[in-house]
Amino acid sequence: MINEDSIQLDTLLKKYYEHSIEKIVFADDNGKIIAMNDAAKDILSEEDNYSAVANAICHRCEGYTNAYDVQSCKDCFLESMQVQATNFQVFMKTKDQKVMPFTATYQLIDQDRGIHAFTLQNVSSQIEQQEKLHQQRMMRKTISAQENERKRISRELHDSVIQEMLNVDVQLRLLKYQEDTTKLLEDAENIEYIVAKLIDDIRNMSVELRPASLDDLGLEAAFKSYFKQFEENYGIKIIYTSNIKNTRFDSDIETVVYRVVQEAILNALKYADVNEINVGIRQTGRHLVAEVIDAGNGFDPSSKPKGSGLGLYGMNERAELVSGSVNIETKIGEGTNVTLNIPI
């Protein structure tokens, strides 16, 4: 290791302070700025002080990043007069009125004299690169979700609609050779029944693809309609609780909540072997939470999932599109609890 005395550490630190692109500000215990390097003068003025409401920072600050927002002034640490050592991401306005992202640190460096250091490092290029990577990931996830949805629709069309239409086609062809009037009427009634069932299948598929009530009336109405249809089709009771009433949310959020709940219910139908499923939707502070709970078979999360596994994967994919998360708690023989949490 190089001997610090031989290279005059104080001189190097002074040169770093004077020539660094990092913005460095020193302040006393009262918040009065006592020194700043040239880089800091792009944002702060030597006449500024932040003894009361952190004026030197606040009058240039456009918000800091917290757990809920990229830019927010809510619960800012500078509102407290007892500021401890901290680091955070903040958006500051430069003297040419450009808003730039910075990584900031604030810490006590000389306890005897009460000297604090406030530093800012521009992270614009890092943020831009992260945003590009995030957009690329989201694009891949979106394309993957779309392809999975297309595959599902293709299977539904082939297994139900097309098969029923082929059945009708055969029945109609046979009518040409039917001479018995009574049998002809029976065949016609059978065709009528098949067509009616085909219409129901197409209608149900349309609702599954995108229920009109979701766009027109929101989650509450869409879920009530879907649960009623689900109970009629499968004989499984849905116990639904909610505190959102007719509250509307962002369209993307409503879509994700609807799809994740729908997928969780269908998984319970396929694998849980239950007579009822509990569904809860609630708004808690700045979060929208959806739960689907069954007391069925459960499964081992560490083992290979039944079926294709795309259902569980798709739920996580959808949640990530709106910065949400899906948590699955399950144990063999003790049921499954699927929880979706989305910041709003």
Curated annotation (Swiss-Prot):
This is Oxygen sensor histidine kinase NreB. It is an enzyme of class 2 (transferase). The keyword Nuclease does not apply. PANTHER family: NITRATE/NITRITE SENSOR PROTEIN NARX-RELATED, NITRATE_NITRITE SENSOR PROTEIN NARQ. It catalyses: ATP + protein L-histidine = ADP + protein N-phospho-L-histidine. Residues 152-344 form the Histidine kinase domain. Autophosphorylated. Its EC number is 2.7.13.3. GO terms for molecular function: 4 iron, 4 sulfur cluster binding; ATP binding; iron ion binding; phosphorelay sensor kinase activity; protein dimerization activity; protein kinase activity. Keywords: 4Fe-4S, ATP-binding, Cytoplasm, Iron, Iron-sulfur, Kinase, Metal-binding, Nucleotide-binding, Phosphoprotein, Transferase, Two-component regulatory system. [4Fe-4S] cluster binds at C58, C61, C73, C76. Its cofactor is [4Fe-4S] cluster. Member of the two-component regulatory system NreB/NreC involved in the control of dissimilatory nitrate/nitrite reduction in response to oxygen. NreB functions as a direct oxygen sensor histidine kinase which is autophosphorylated, in the absence of oxygen, probably at the conserved histidine residue, and transfers its phosphate group probably to a conserved aspartate residue of NreC. NreB/NreC activates the expression of the nitrate (narGHJI) and nitrite (nir) reductase operons, as well as the putative nitrate transporter gene narT. The modification Phosphohistidine is found at H158. GO terms for cellular component: cytoplasm; plasma membrane.
